[in-house]
Design a protein with these regions (language model features):
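Chalcogenol-based redox active-site neighborhoods
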Residues: 1-164, 168-173, 180-183
Length: 186
């Protein structure tokens, strides 16, 4: 399991639009349709990565808590499903059901969404304000598989608390660590 850090995109960057298949309802959805009134969290995740499996339950808990404040959550899987069949849309849907996802789980078949977001690893978190300007990018918390630190979503929660109060904490930005996105071979 190779550790890959997230790419630290500049704060203030606008969220690129997309139109991706939501495997939970078998329908294409755009960012404009899914964004939250107060803010939007875009998470690059997948099914097979141990780092993602480690945080899935916490992600759902945080999403349930902050959706009440007008923040929407969107999960995207961009992995090459030919070489990583565990990340297929069918198994994505099963994963969403197993973990009781309360947010859309989108399949980025062309990987273009991961490219324009400069996503580097799974899990990777991007928090946008109501104008879809980036206010946080990075990790959920310091917990990793096997390091015995609590998986509490502390960093993401702090970023969301700042967002709710219309503030940005530039010192809070800490890269995520996870599995690299599994890029298709040309």
């Amino acid at each position: 399991m190779a550790k890959t850090p997230s790419n630290m995109v500049s704060l203030g960057t606008k969220a690129p639009d997309f139109n991706l298949l939501d495997v939970t309802i078998d329908s294409f959805k755009s960012l404009d349709e899914l964004k939250g009134d107060k803010g939007t969290v875009i998470m690059f995740i997948c099914n097979h990565c141990p780092y993602v499996k480690h945080v899935n339950t916490t992600i759902v808990e945080i999403a349930k808590k902050y959706q009440q404040s007008g923040i929407k959550f969107i999960a995207i899987s961009s992995n090459d499903v030919l070489n990583y069949p565990e990340d297929s849309p069918e198994l994505m849907k099963e994963n969403a059901i197993e973990y009781n996802f309360c947010f859309p789980y989108l399949y980025d078949e062309t990987q273009q969404t991961a490219i324009v977001y400069d996503a580097g690893c799974t899990p990777d978190f991007y928090v946008y304000n109501s104008d879809l300007e980036l206010v946080y990018r990075g990790q959920l918390d310091d917990s990793r598989p096997g390091n015995n630190l609590p998986c509490d979503g502390n960093d993401l929660s702090h970023a969301l608390n700042f967002l709710i109060t219309n503030k940005v904490n530039e010192k809070l930005q800490k890269p995520s660590i996870g599995c690299n996105i599994k890029w298709k071979v040309s």
